[in-house]
Amino acid sequence: MMKGSPPTVEEERALCAVGYRAIAGIDEAGRGCWAGPVVAAAVILPERVIAKPELLDGVADSKMLTPAQRVALFERITSLAVAWAVGSVPAHVIDSHGILPATRLAMQVALLRLPLPADVLLIDAVRLDGWPLPQRVLVKGDVRCLSIAAASIIAKVMRDRFMEGLGRYWTRYGFAAHKGYGTAAHQEALRRYGPTPHHRLTFRPLCDMAPANIRNAALEGEQP
């Protein structure tokens, strides 16, 4: 359920006032999960939404919304957006490069996939060093800024859908329910069956498991 003040278009209007038009809000989902990819979204909202933000009334940081609210808002955001795209970086890249570089990579992939190039970025908390566009990095940007909040919803819904699909193959792990987060049920599944190829082996409690405990669940009836 949404709490507190809704995100505003103050940042977007300030950028429009100095001539920017294709303003991309960027955020990620799944950074703290034990399993699955980190997913980033980039979204460019139209000028009419920046002029009239009530067109996206209800948009907030995705963590403050119910799953049903996120899906309904996802449909509204993507139908109104000038452009949107997602980038996804899998667990093995997170393990080899670290979660922060993987998050930056997911954001860069999302930007490269935009059908309309952005000319300025509004990003939640993470600076894209070396990226050839001006950027505003906002702490708690998904709470403060409408474009970033919209990106957070897109990233969360798209990642949830991926994890639900993963759960149809790796049926013992409950991915559709916990989406890869560190719940008691997830920890129990890890204890019983060991990690899958989609688990982040550098994250606790995964990194505390002996390599001998890493099972090939496909041999026990699971699918990759």
Curated annotation (Swiss-Prot):
InterPro entries registered for this protein in UniProt: RNase_HII, RNase_HII/HIII, RNase_HII/HIII_dom, RNaseH-like_sf, RNaseH_sf
Pfam families, per the entry: RNase_HII (PF01351)
Keyword flag Transport: no
Domain called RNase H type-2: residue spans: 21-223
Residues annotated for a divalent metal cation binding in this entry: 27-28, 124
Compartment(s): Cytoplasm
Recorded catalytic activity of this chain's protein: Endonucleolytic cleavage to 5'-phosphomonoester
EC number, as in UniProt: 3.1.26.4
GO cellular component terms listed in the entry, alphabetical order: cytoplasm; ribonuclease H2 complex
Cytoplasm found in the keyword field: yes
Main function: Endonuclease that specifically degrades the RNA of RNA-DNA hybrids.
Family to which this protein belongs: Belongs to the RNase HII family.
Record NCBIfam families: PRK00015.1-3
Protein name (Swiss-Prot/TrEMBL): Ribonuclease HII
Organism: Roseiflexus castenholzii (strain DSM 13941 / HLO8)
Gene: rnhB
